[in-house]
Amino acid sequence: RDYGTSIADFYTNIWWPDMIALATAHNVQYTGVIIENYEDETDGETERQDDVQRFQYFGNMILHQGGELGYHGYNHQPLSLSDTDYGDALPYKTWTSFSAMEKAMKELMDFGKEMFPETTMSVYVPPSNVLSEAGRKMVPCIPRSVLLPAIIFPATMLMCRSLKWLKMES
């Protein structure tokens, strides 16, 4: 159905109020995960997101209804290096180095702390549920994070599939 509005306005004014009403009616608490931007850069050069109003709006609404916040990725590129071959399965780029992944994740964590200074981020959900061996080594660096358990997938990717939570040890 056509609502005659932009995608951003649709989410803010139509979809989100419906989701909050659903959560209230059924005592559901949401988990929101942050993606700072959708740029495809994977060289470790990061730029702080300056359009923060929507992050704060949705994040604070989730927290106000008893939900939790976490991380999804600096730019929705999976934490994978050049030894990962997505084949035709996924349209993603790989990171140029482990250091580049670290810089991007540090920027994401700093951004999350700036947006929600009193909140402990408790979840890491890999972009498209893809987490390479190199990416897995980085997850313990994310403070107090939990991760969906994963199964090994060919081409050195890990695809998260289970709904059981696994506490990642530092």
Go through the PLM ranges and name each one.
Residues 24, 63, 140:
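Anion (oxyanion) recognition and catalysis
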Residues 29-132, 152:
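Metal-dependent polysaccharide deacetylase catalytic core of the NodB/CE4 family, i.e.
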Residues 13, 17, 111, 143, ...:
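Generic detector of bulky aromatic hydrophobic side chains
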Residues 1-6, 136-137, 141-170:
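C-terminal active-site subregion of NodB/CE4 polysaccharide deacetylases
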